[in-house]
Structure formats: structure tokens, C-alpha cells
A protein has these predicted regions:
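Conserved short S/T/G-enriched processing/targeting/catalytic segments and their helical context
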Residues: 1-82, 89, 98, 104-134
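Short, flexible beta-strand-to-coil junctions
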Residues: 7-8, 86-91, 143, 155
């Protein structure tokens, strides 16, 4: 992972990821990665959507709500996808709202092998050998350590 900038307590990064379990491939880079205590989450989507998602997640955590509601700005967005990965207590969840969908989905991708790198969509032959590299990177961010050789870069 390469950290490229800091702005308003976000860490901008160039993470992209590929999942090869049900042929779900997402080759869009994270635009923002944020740490909130033991929770780390990365997002890709419009800037305002990422801001709204961050605020909704913080409200959900701080107020101990039982149900998470995706912000209206994301649900009503029709010209771009929104994806967030949330890492907490060793689990990696993917929240996504794609352009043509009317609902958002939450998936547990902790056990899905993943590869990180700008060229990850070219690496189908080695994905089965990789651990969940997303979780590795998010765990590293949680402790302010960046990869330490654990992530297989494929670009």
C-alpha cells in the first residue's frame, strides 16, 4: 500500500482489489482510508458519498445503533458505484451500492482470497495462493505499519 496524502484525518491511498470467489472483480482504487480506533475502513466513490458514509458509520458506532443505514446521498446516486470495506476484530466486510442497484449489500469477505495492487485484475492465476490481502493492509493501517512485506503486490 502506498500512502499518498493526508487531508482532514483521511489517508488517501491507491489500494485496488480483486476477489475471485463468485467472479466478483472490483478494480477501482480506494480513494479514502480512515482509522477510527480499532476500526479501519476504506472507500471508493464520490467525495460527498465518502464523507456521508464516514459520518453515518461514526454515528452508528458512537450511538450503539442496532441497524446501519446507508446515507441517502449514496442510495440516490445514479452515476457512480460506492464501495466501502470495513475491518473490525479480524473481520472484513464489504458494503456496496452499485449504479444500477436500488439497495446496498453487505458481505463478509474475510475468507475470500484477495490480491492488492493496481494491476491485480491481471493476476487470476495467483489469487488462490493469496490470503485476504485487504485484511492484512487494514490491520497494518490499524497499527500504523504499512505492509511489512505481508501483502503480495501484483502490479
Amino acid at each position: 500500500m502506498t500512502t499518498t496524502a493526508y487531508d482532514t484525518h483521511f489517508m488517501a491511498s491507491d489500494i485496488a482489489f480483486t476477489v475471485n470467489r463468485t467472479e466478483v472483480t472490483l478494480n477501482i482504487p480506494f480513494r479514502k482510508v480512515k482509522r477510527l480506533g480499532d476500526i479501519v475502513f476504506g472507500m471508493a466513490g464520490c467525495l460527498f458519498c465518502m464523507r456521508d458514509f464516514s459520518e453515518a458509520l461514526i454515528d452508528f458506532i458512537l450511538q450503539n445503533k442496532t441497524q446501519f443505514e446507508l446515507p441517502r446521498s449514496i442510495l440516490e446516486k445514479t452515476n457512480s458505484d460506492f464501495i466501502a470495506l470495513i475491518y473490525l476484530s479480524g473481520s472484513c466486510l464489504k458494503v456496496s451500492k452499485m449504479v444500477n442497484d436500488t439497495e446496498f449489500t453487505i458481505e463478509n469477505i474475510t475468507n475470500v482470497p484477495t490480491v492488492i495492487g493496481s494491476g491485480s485484475f491481471h493476476t487470476q492465476h495467483i489469487i488462490h495462493d493469496c490470503p485476504n490481502a485487504i485484511a492484512v493492509v487494514l490491520e497494518a493501517i490499524k497499527y500504523d505499519q504499512y505492509t511489512a512485506g505481508e501483502v503480495k503486490y501484483c502490479s
